[in-house]
From Swiss-Prot:
This is Protein RecA. Coiled coil: none annotated. GO terms for biological process: DNA recombination; DNA repair; SOS response. One of its GO terms (molecular function) is ATP-dependent DNA damage sensor activity. Its main location: cytoplasm. It is found in: Cytoplasm. Can catalyze the hydrolysis of ATP in the presence of single-stranded DNA, the ATP-dependent uptake of single-stranded DNA by duplex DNA, and the ATP-dependent hybridization of homologous single-stranded DNAs. It interacts with LexA causing its activation and leading to its autocatalytic cleavage. ATP binds at G66, P67, E68, S69, S70, G71, K72, T73. One of its GO terms (cellular component) is cytosol. It comes from Streptomyces lividans. Pfam families: RecA, RecA_C. Keywords: ATP-binding, Cytoplasm, DNA damage, DNA recombination, DNA repair, DNA-binding, Nucleotide-binding, SOS response.
Amino acid sequence: MAGTDREKALDAALAQIERQFGKGAVMRMGDRTNEPIEVIPTGSTALDVALGVGGIPRGRVVEVYGPESSGKTTLTLHAVANAQKAGGQVAFVDAEHALDPEYAKKLGVDIDNLILSQPDNGEQALEIVDMLVRSGALDLIVIDSVAALVPRAEIEGEMGDSHVGLQARLMSQALRKITSALNQSKTTAIFINQLREKIGVMFGSPETTTGGRALKFYASVRLDIRRIETLKDGTDAVGNRTRVKVVKNKVAPPFKQAEFDILYGQGISREGGLIDMGVENGFVRKAGAWYTYEGDQLGQGKENARNFLKDNPDLANEIEKKIKQKLGVGVHPEESATEPGADAASAAPADAAPAVPAPTTAKATKSKAAAAKS
């Protein structure tokens, strides 16, 4: 077949596919508009930089896992607050039945407009997730946690019954269904996960996450969060130093790390992170115990400098913008003239995210094909 005949045959096939499955079902990559990746800021500048795109990517599956009390829910609630500040709709599926509304409020979450579900079993939870995602009205949905998505058969069965692989099959089926809908509706799904230990592992890490392997494959970003140090004020513990490793990243280079402070009752210390990154990148000068920025003293000791930036948010926004511009993350050239703090606009909701139809039955598919032929 000659080259022109092959091209004509391909064009005819593409036209037939578009007629049968709708416009955009197949296209040449050059015809697709190359839009920057939309993100939701995490609340930590260091983590936004480590992610490579300025935050958690929209329309993707994200897994956050780590030991108990490492900051998984805190990190996720900051993402929820940032999505809401940008005008987005957020749902929180609390399978653990452990969400503290007062703590969420302190972190900046608008609890009055947060859509909350506390399902009875794993099937119900994932069905709710599927329906909410297909509505096309959400910007972010959080599932806390995968380990708490207990299959109905396990709940209704006896305590000693064995249900090998039941939860893994449930997660695999759910992710197959929702991944496409997430991408079409630009909804981000954050799955919080717990750690377990494999028995009899002699070499390598014995740690593994719950829910089988499906989530590892479907997740575009996987974050391993660990508490590395306890922050103290005298003898009193006031927070934790936390390290997050980007174990998997499909939107930027992986294996980068970020460290930040989580203060009890306050969440991630954005100002503390800005001081650390400001010193690292040469914007904030540290001489002895004093921190200075462009000749102005921020304070003696990190705690005083942190409080100064907290009282002067415009200055904090200015330092953050300079750090992100230097590292080429999260700030686009056309945004350089916008007001401070406007980088969260990259998390703005899609104005007209289409509702994603539920999967059609084989019968409906045949009738559509017959209509296309006629």
